[in-house]
């Protein structure tokens, strides 16, 4: 069955925003990230950055355990389809394939070099095919076989008085033996009704137990004990004819001593996947083989069981490459599977790199595919062709993670660990900057956290700009100003402040802008923000009853010609309110002492300044109105593109002019009276 197919991609890496990976798979990738980070921590604390065999094995087992947990969760999952439309069973089959490959690479790579390869492969087979019913898809079928096949057979046979009378009993025994699963064969033989009294059965059980012990002992550097036991079996069958009354026990003996005809006969009968029985073939016929001899051994095996290399699926080709100790070819097949295998290839290559950095050097891996990473790398470095496979895979995987709205946060870990230095940081800067946070301010804040952690200046400014503009469109001017203040430039701060001064929010709301309480000296360089801060202070002083101080600040705002006309209208309204308050008894004064009911005191020069400012503003408004009326009939002013388009339509301009004129007419006599009172004082 073709497992690595670009038609069956996992959701990670899907270019479609609607295609998201299954929640269980997402948890798996988070688990892998935690193990990845742990591996980096271990490598950094070791001289040379190379993880010892024991450490690499521990990390490898953790990766495999994470895949197995995901498989168990999928078995318990009720949904038949993932959110990307993928069949849950199909996803389970893919994870089974990856589990099989990872454990096989672990068996042939993270092992003492002096150990016999046959024992490591037998352990791999026993772990992956515990019932010899493959946990991965059969080559002959399109469905997962029952992983508890042997347990089901045993449960049925236990209820029978004579299990050996049933064909399924001996089929199970011989199939287990074909795979060199001696423990299962021994267990099944014990269900034989005559087991306790039959000398041949007892003898066979003892032999199988001895074989099992001899193979999986602590010292795995030789198979002398196994060869001695096999010679003993030859003697029992040839000379003593111990098993002549038990045809099936005779088959077991024939397999054990390496009879090719028997092996082929039962392989053709049961038709298991070739890689399930290859470790047994290696034990029965070439137990002392080394890694260098494996290609020749496999050729003999394929000739015996009539398997053709050109008919192998991509999964089988990958397994074959690994068993032949051609791991580079195996990695090429894995990497060529596309995005579906990227997460698997990335973590596998990373672990191999830190176990032996020379093994995956750029020369050996230069021809290995790396998806879309190369194009991205080319845009950041002229020497990108010299980057090793690990770096290229980490970049590609990070790209894919940024395409999933719940996995993007872990992408930074991979880019920073890529060893690309400033190139990796610039790539991360671009990916964060281009990430679509869909107007979610919570996501934007998390992106900004990444920017601060890894000093991503460009991305930080882009996100803040987008955030400010979005809040302005939503009318959230106070929040927009708060985010604009976090930018390195004053451009947006100036624009947002000016729009607030022009009336984007009410004067009372300006007095509630608590962001000014936490400001430092950064607003000194922005005149618009200074005006806002002064007006905020003015409103706060009014609320606190500090009229004298409030009037002095209002005076400063009044004589500042940098503020927009709309803001002057606001100042007029505030001045009118204050002057009106002078004509009312002030709250809090003692009504029994009316002589103390005096105004807070308007300074003569202060009133004169306000009067002059009012006159100049009135004259300016008249000139602007005249120019607008005369120019409007002759030409239409070409619109200019601005960050915040001003509200400068003809109707709004006329309305504002009329409003300012009315306010000035109201304010002028009040200021005149206030000035007269000052002179009378």
Where are these regions (language model features)?
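Short helix-adjacent coil turns
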Residues: 50, 54-57, 61, 65, ...
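Extended amphipathic alpha-helical scaffold segments
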Residues: 156-214, 315-337, 395-419, 430-431, ...
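Extended alpha-helical solenoid scaffold regions that build the rod-like backbones
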Residues: 170, 241, 245-467, 570-571
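Short, charge-rich, low-complexity alpha-helical interaction segments
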Residues: 100-155, 340-369, 429-444, 505
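Solenoid-repeat scaffolds in large eukaryotic assemblies
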Residues: 184-186, 330-333, 345, 361, ...
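Long, acidic/serine-threonine-rich intrinsically disordered regions with weak helical/coil propensity
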Residues: 1-132, 287-344, 383-407, 420
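Short, charge-rich amphipathic alpha-helical segments embedded
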Residues: 192-216, 331-358, 419-437, 488-507, ...
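Long alpha-helical scaffold regions
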Residues: 1-7, 12-15, 19-61, 67, ...
């Amino acid at each position: 069955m073709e497992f690595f197919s670009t038609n069956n991609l996992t959701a990670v890496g899907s270019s479609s925003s609607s295609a998201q990976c299954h929640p269980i798979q997402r948890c798996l990738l988070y688990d892998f990230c935690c193990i990845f980070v742990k591996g980096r921590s271990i490598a950094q604390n070791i001289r040379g950055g190379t993880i010892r065999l024991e450490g690499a094995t521990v990390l490898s087992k953790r990766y495999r355990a994470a895949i197995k947990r995901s498989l168990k969760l999928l078995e318990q999952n009720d949904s038949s389809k993932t959110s990307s439309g993928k069949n849950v069973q199909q996803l389970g089959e893919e994870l089974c394939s990856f589990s099989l490959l990872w454990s096989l690479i672990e068996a042939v790579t993270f092992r003492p070099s002096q150990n016999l390869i046959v024992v490591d492969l037998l352990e791999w087979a026993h772990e992956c095919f515990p019932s010899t019913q493959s946990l991965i898809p059969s080559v002959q079928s399109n469905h997962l076989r029952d992983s508890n096949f042997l347990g089901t057979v045993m449960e049925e046979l236990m209820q029978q008085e004579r299990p050996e009378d049933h064909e399924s009993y001996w089929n199970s025994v011989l199939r287990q033996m074909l795979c060199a699963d001696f423990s299962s064969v021994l267990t099944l033989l014990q269900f034989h009704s005559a087991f306790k009294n039959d000398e041949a059965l007892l003898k066979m059980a003892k032999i199988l137990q001895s074989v099992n012990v001899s193979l999986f002992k602590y010292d795995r550097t030789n198979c002398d004990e196994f060869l001695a036991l096999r010679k003993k079996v030859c003697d029992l069958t040839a000379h003593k004819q111990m098993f002549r009354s038990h045809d099936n026990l005779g088959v077991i003996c024939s397999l054990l001593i390496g009879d090719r005809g028997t092996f082929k006969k039962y392989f053709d009968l049961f038709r298991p996947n070739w890689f399930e029985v290859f470790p047994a073939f290696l034990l029965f016929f070439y137990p002392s083989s080394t890694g260098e001899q494996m290609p020749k051994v496999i050729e003999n095996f394929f000739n015996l069981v009539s398997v053709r290399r050109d008919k192998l699926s991509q999964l089988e080709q990958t397994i074959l490459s690994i068993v032949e100790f051609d791991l580079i070819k195996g990695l090429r097949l894995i990497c060529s599977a596309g995005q579906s295998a990227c997460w698997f290839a990335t973590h596998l290559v990373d672990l191999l790199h830190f176990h032996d950095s020379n093994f995956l050097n750029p020369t050996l891996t230069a021809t290995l595919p790396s998806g879309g990473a190369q194009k991205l790398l080319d845009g950041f470095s002229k020497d990108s062709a010299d980057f090793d496979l690990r770096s290229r895979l980490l970049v590609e995987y990070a790209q894919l993670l940024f395409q999933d709205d719940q996995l993007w946060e872990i992408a930074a870990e991979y880019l920073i660990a890529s060893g690309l230095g400033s190139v990796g940081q610039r790539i991360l800067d671009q990916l964060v900057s281009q990430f679509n946070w869909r107007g979610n301010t919570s996501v934007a804040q998390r992106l900004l956290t990444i920017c601060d952690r890894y000093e991503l200046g460009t991305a930080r400014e882009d996100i803040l700009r987008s955030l400010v503009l979005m809040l302005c469109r939503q009318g959230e001017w106070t929040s927009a100003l708060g985010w604009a203040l976090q930018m390195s430039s004053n451009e947006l701060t100036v624009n947002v402040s000016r729009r607030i001064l022009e009336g984007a929010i009410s004067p009372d709301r300006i007095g509630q802008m608590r962001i000014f309480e936490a400001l430092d000296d950064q607003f000194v360089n922005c005149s618009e923000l200074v005006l806002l801060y002064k007006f905020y202070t003015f409103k706060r002083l009014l609320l606190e009853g500090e009229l004298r101080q409030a009037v002095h600040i209002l005076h400063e705002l009044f004589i500042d010609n940098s503020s927009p006309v709309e803001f002057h209208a606001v100042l007029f309204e505030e001045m009118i309110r204050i002057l009106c308050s002078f004509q009312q008894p002030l709250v809090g004064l003692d009504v029994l002492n009316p002589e103390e009911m005096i105004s807070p005191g308007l300074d003569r020069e202060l009133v004169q300044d306000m009067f002059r400012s009012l006159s100049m503003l009135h004259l300016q408004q008249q000139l602007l109105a005249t120019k607008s009326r005369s120019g409007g009939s002759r030409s239409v002013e070409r619109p200019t593109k601005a960050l915040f388009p001003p509200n400068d339509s003809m109707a709004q301009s006329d309305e504002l002019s009329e409003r300012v004129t009315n306010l000035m007419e109201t304010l002028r006599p009040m200021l005149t009276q206030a000035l007269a009172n000052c002179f009378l004082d």
